[in-house]
Amino acid sequence: MDIAWIEWINVLFRFTHVLAAIMWIGNSLLFTWMELNLVVPRTDDAKGQPRDPDLMGTLDMLHGGGVFHLEKRVMHAHAIPERLHWFKWQSYTTWITGLVLLGALFWSNGTTLLDATRTALSPATAVLCSLAGLLGGWLVYDGIWRSPLGRKPILAATASLLALFTAAHFYGQIFNGRALFLQIGAMMGTFMSANVFVHIMGNQHKFMRSLRQGRPYDSRYGKAAKSRSLHNHYMTFPVLFLMLSAHFPRLYAADWNVPILAIVVIALMAIKHLMNSRYHFKYWLWWIFGTVAVSAHLIGILLHLPPPAALAQGAMPPDPAVLSGKTLFQTQACATCHMQGSSQIGPSLYGIYGTTQELADGSRALVDDAYIKTSLLDPASQVVKGFAPAMPSFAGKLDDGQVADLIAYIRSLTPQIPRAQAAP
């Protein structure tokens, strides 16, 4: 696909994706908040009148200089409102635009998914693995909650998370960090949208069809829809984080990115639960602070651990210069554009040292220490052909020692290149 079309698709569909997601997640948060704050009517009202048996709860909300008085009621066939609002297209639009973005940015060029330092999979196989995760992940998740295990929410939720993190471990062996986080986010987003289509809308259609056929109110359909709606509610925070994960290269480019992903997902679900508990749990806010502190501490430990392979093999600690350069590579957001595999933003630095690159002005340059240093301090003069001149200059931002450390790290990404090729 022509790069210009990909960029236009990126702009249009990314904005639509974000806009629809805001509307969808906003609905999820609001409806659950209203459910939690409904005031269940007493046996008799203040005037001594018997309680309305069809009234499930009331809620008064102050906004815009007035009060919204909300009632949740049992609906009967003779009292179906003429104008009834359904909430589904926010979900469908989010999922469809997300799928288009995955196709344009990752599936159209499967190498953007892969970590070439870990796998020799073909781009086509990588795309198939990604697609299989969306469909297979939904089938596993839905199967868990349809099974007898689904009647035990804590066990079913644990099984669902274990299945999700198993998938993350698998993709962590073949995908680069950015693609890994977005893949798991896309899988969770698929669970949510499929919940809307299959269970929430499906049961609501059954409910309305039953009423229009004159049958009495049946609470089973509403309970089934509400259960999956609550699933979606708890997935909102993790999906938002993973949706924005391209902005967190320090995390997705880490050696221990799969455990970091797991900690983030669990912590954000726990925080959502604590927020829901605020009306009956006195210390909910302190527990949120504690969850954030513990999660940040665990992630901090993982960020400073040697790579898993080094720990498993008992390897010697890495060169301090390489380790410092790697930290700079992550904290300076280099990994955002120069990730493993190929990128549409900047060239991958994995295996680039010692190669000859064609520049935008038609000249050719050997990628050695001198080239990397010039690229860092004066990137406009070293733009590789096919990429936009978007790299910022680090002149005045990095001292000579930091530049040397970054060069050492980039050199280490091509270990087969002899040290003698380094510029003096």
Residues of each region from the PLM?
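Generic structural signal for secondary-structure transition and capping sites
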Residues: 233, 334, 380-384, 415-418
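C-terminal capping alpha-helices of c-type cytochrome domains
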Residues: 392-423
